[in-house]
Amino acid sequence: MHILKKPDLSDPKMRAKLAKGMGHNYYGEPAWPNDLLYIFPVVILGTIACVVGLAVLDPAMLADKADPFATPLEILPEWYLYPVFQILRVVPNKLLGIALQTLVPLGLMLVPFIESFNKFQNPFRRPVAMTVFLTGTLVTIYLGIGAALPIDKSLTLGLF
């Protein structure tokens, strides 16, 4: 594409326009109608064809029908709510579980004030922020894995 859109510098009129700074409008392939009428529909229709083709070749199978009289032993939330579910499931006092969940946003709001002395943007030169981030990430992963396990194995992740 770069070679096709290069201006012809042997043309004296083009060189004069380029010298005046007017060259970007006078050479190459115009956006209207070429891009908007020909290339964009091809890309859009190609994307739709890929999605429809994948849906036809590998359809998502429907699960069993819901049976209101056969409740599972433990109802799990969606995967992104596993850490919160694990906190509420493990902590004996539910009010304490809610209080622990409010500590997460409060802790995140305190990080800029704790590390206000550090002027670096590089994460490796900000040890407090990196420690808070890595600890929070590891605790979230730990709680998420534990929520998928039965309650008796959830704290040890079934390792002990």
From Swiss-Prot:
The lineage of its organism: Bacteria, Bacillati, Cyanobacteriota, Cyanophyceae, Synechococcales. Belongs to the cytochrome b family. PetD subfamily. The 4 large subunits of the cytochrome b6-f complex are cytochrome b6, subunit IV (17 kDa polypeptide, PetD), cytochrome f and the Rieske protein, while the 4 small subunits are PetG, PetL, PetM and PetN. The complex functions as a dimer. The chain crosses the membrane at residues 36-56, 95-115, 131-151. Keywords: Electron transport, Membrane, Photosynthesis, Thylakoid, Transmembrane, Transmembrane helix, Transport. One of its GO terms (molecular function) is electron transporter, transferring electrons within the cyclic electron transport pathway of photosynthesis activity. This is Cytochrome b6-f complex subunit 4. The gene is petD. The keyword Transmembrane helix applies. One of its GO terms (cellular component) is plasma membrane-derived thylakoid membrane. It is a multi-pass membrane protein. Its main location: membrane. InterPro entries: Cyt_b/b6_C (IPR005798), Cyt_b/b6_C_sf (IPR036150), Cyt_b6/f_cplx_suIV (IPR005870), Cytochrome_b_C_euk/bac (IPR048260). GO terms for biological process: photosynthetic electron transport chain. It is found in: Cellular thylakoid membrane. Component of the cytochrome b6-f complex, which mediates electron transfer between photosystem II (PSII) and photosystem I (PSI), cyclic electron flow around PSI, and state transitions. The keyword Secreted does not apply. PROSITE patterns: CYTB_CTER (PS51003).
